UniProtKB/Swiss-Prot annotation:
This is Elongation factor 4. Pfam families: EFG_C, GTP_EFTU, GTP_EFTU_D2, LepA_C. NCBIfam families: lepA (TIGR01393), small_GTP (TIGR00231). It catalyses: GTP + H2O = GDP + phosphate + H(+). InterPro entries: EF-4, EFG_III/V, EFG_V-like, EFTu-like_2, G_TR_CS, GUFP, LepA_C_sf, LepA_CTD. The gene is lepA. One of its GO terms (cellular component) is plasma membrane. It is found in: Cell inner membrane.
């Protein structure tokens, strides 16, 4: 199965924005080449997580090997590496691009170029990939292929004279795409005689075989009898099996340069087989690793707490297991007076955070509370020490610190012209600095802003979508830290600080946020036997307060008439009891109240 000459190998990926039909196109390619029979075919064949199908997005990378008989009568092997389209998963895209020589740029013929497509196209151009523009969904009534071709030329600068129009749904144009892959994408370089180097572009955890590593061989070859060495961790393994994905795993004896395959070697955790790492042979190791891999850094942090304290060990096990297959997830134990034991977790972005939370709840049957997302702040202490703070509750007191810097991103928003005003208003509300505005076509515009990441991670995306009826798309990347007048806003419930509700806000917004928080808590916390003060404070200064009045038991109900002093005595006794209760009583804040307030942080 693997004795294909390098000249007849093609490695390519598909770049597309969410919903532009990438997974459906991949399905058609698999079907047309006979890789998957029509009987076994199910929609979004390569998206094999339930969550991926439901949300219609690709999260984990998949790969598939197809045999294709081209017009010249020769049989070619096409390796399709499926990539995620969402901005959070751009690191997954970058490593799959490194394993390819070409890419299909899929653009919806009715919607045009979107922000995340652009980000990935630039990554592909940096990797010197041959890009084939494909206009999908030409069967839709609103499709305008000529207009979209001009858009691709003006925005990306690609020649679209050979762009292929297709409809992945009906199958129109699929044979032309397969032929274009053979004709226009170059074959891999023939480096079979050099030292073995293979790039890991994905890995997942199999409970029976350990970590399954997907790799692309850049030079040399790997056979089943070899002992392999992973260059960054310096660990060596004996191979249990190697093979190709067709798209089900098929064992083979050896693979050579240019080929894409998988290996199993009883590797315990995905962290041992880091994506982007280089595989070489123990007997004939390569001198240096493949260039260009940076470890994924979490950008967004939040606390995860089980609603039931008994589930803490289950949550720990679940995170351990998830980390086996998600190398970008970072976590450490955390305790909170209000929530008990939990974990502080780091994610690539909001979508990544939602997906991890959903997978924990769905696959591991956990019930979780998630605190408000925060970013990493850079705090300069008075003694000159620099501290990185990812949990607002641990921000040092004002008298101990000199400055606080927060991460900024450069954001590009692509939207129809009509929504200019409302989008600029949104960016200004979120402390964004206007940089530039460009008209891409007569009716589409790009807005460029520099904006604090903390303002983006709450609900910027939802707001942008709702204000533009879903037509806007955005892309952002980190540009560094800037100093701002930031303060820590604490919420006190009955004079006790509620850690999960602590946030870091800009001084100008502190009053509005604090007032909103205490008002919401007042609605949600049930009345107790004593009065509960709710306060929002900056340091020792209270900036907003509300009170929950006490439940009052009618102690006079048994006194019919009688002496007033008897009534006074009973009321005095009740007041004394309430006073004692207030000093000793603990307010039990229901989980729903925390959840609702954390949602309010987004409104």
């Amino acid at each position: 199965m693997t004795n294909v000459p390098i000249s007849r190998l093609r490695n390519f990926c598909i770049i597309a924005h969410i919903d532009h039909g990438k997974s459906t196109l991949a399905d058609r390619l698999l079907q047309d080449t006979g890789t998957v029979s029509s009987r076994d075919m199910q929609e979004q064949f390569l998206d094999n997580m339930d969550l991926e199908r439901e949300r219609g997005i690709t999260i984990k990378l998949q790969a598939a090997r197809m045999n294709y008989k081209a017009d010249d009568g020769e049989e070619y092997v096409l390796n399709l590496i499926d990539t995620p389209g969402h901005v959070d998963f751009s690191y997954e895209v970058s490593r799959s691009l490194q394993a390819c020589e070409g890419a299909l740029l899929v653009v919806d013929a009715s919607q045009g170029v979107e922000a995340q497509t652009l980000a990935n196209v630039y990554l592909a151009l940096e990797n010197d990939l041959e890009i084939i523009p494909v206009l999908n969904k030409v069967d839709l009534p609103g499709a305008d292929p000529e207009k979209i071709k001009n858009e691709i030329e003006s925005i990306i600068g690609l020649d679209t004279s050979k762009a292929i129009s297709c409809s992945a749904k009906t199958g129109v144009g699929i044979p032309e795409i397969l032929q274009a892959v053979v004709d226009r994408i170059p074959s891999p370089k023939d480096n079979t005689d050099q030292a073995t180097k293979a790039l890991i572009f994905d890995s997942y955890y199999d409970p029976y075989r350990g970590v399954i590593v997907y790799f692309r061989i850049m030079s040399g070859g790997i056979s089943k009898k070899d002992k392999v060495l992973l260059m960054s961790s310096k660990k060596s393994y004996e191979l249990d099996e190697i093979g190709v994905m067709a798209p089900d795993q098929v064992k083979v004896n050896s693979l050579h340069a240019g080929e894409v395959g998988y290996l199993a070697a009883s590797i315990k955790a995905v962290a041992d087989a880091r994506v982007g790492d280089t595989i070489t042979l123990v007997d004939r190791p390569a001198q240096d690793a493949l260039p260009g891999y940076a470890e994924a850094k979490p950008m967004v942090f939040c606390g995860l707490f089980p609603t039931d304290a008994d589930q803490y060990p289950d949550l720990r096990d679940a995170l351990d297991k998830l980390q086996l297959s998600d190398a970008a997830l970072k976590y450490e134990p955390e305790t909170s007076s209000a929530m008990g034991f939990g974990f502080r977790c780091g994610f690539l972005g909001l979508l990544h955070m939602e997906i991890v939370q959903e997978r924990l709840e769905r696959e591991y049957d956990l019930d979780l509370i998630v605190t408000a997302p925060s970013v990493i702040y850079k705090v300069k202490m008075i003694d000159g020490e620099i501290r990185m703070i990812d949990n607002p509750a641990t921000l040092p007191d004002p008298q101990k610190r000199e400055t606080i810097e927060e991460p900024y991103v450069r954001m590009e928003i692509y939207a129809p012209n009509d929504y200019n005003g409302t989008l600029m208003g949104l960016c200004q509300d979120r402390r964004g600095d206007f940089i530039d505005m460009k008209y891409i076509t007569t009716d589409r515009v790009t807005l460029i802003y520099e904006i604090p990441l903390a303002e983006v991670v709450t609900d910027f995306f939802d707001q942008m979508k709702s204000r533009t009826k879903g037509y806007a798309s955005m892309e952002y990347h980190l540009i560094g830290y800037r100093e701002n007048d930031l303060v820590r806003l604490d919420v006190l419930i009955n004079s006790e600080r509620a850690d999960p509700l602590t946030t870091i806000v800009h001084k100008d917004n502190a009053y509005g946020v604090g007032k909103g928080l205490v008002e919401k808590l007042k609605e949600l916390i049930p009345k107790q036997q004593f009065k509960i003060p709710l306060q929002a404070s900056i340091g020792s200064r209270i900036i907003a307060s509300e009170g929950i009045s006490a439940l009052r038991k009618d102690v006079l109900s048994k006194c019919y008439g009688g002496d007033i002093s008897r009534k006074k005595k009973l009321l005095k006794k009740q007041a004394k009891g309430k006073k004692r209760m207030k000093s000793m009583g603990k307010v039990d804040v229901p989980q729903e109240a925390f959840m609702a307030v954390l949602k309010l942080n987004k409104d």
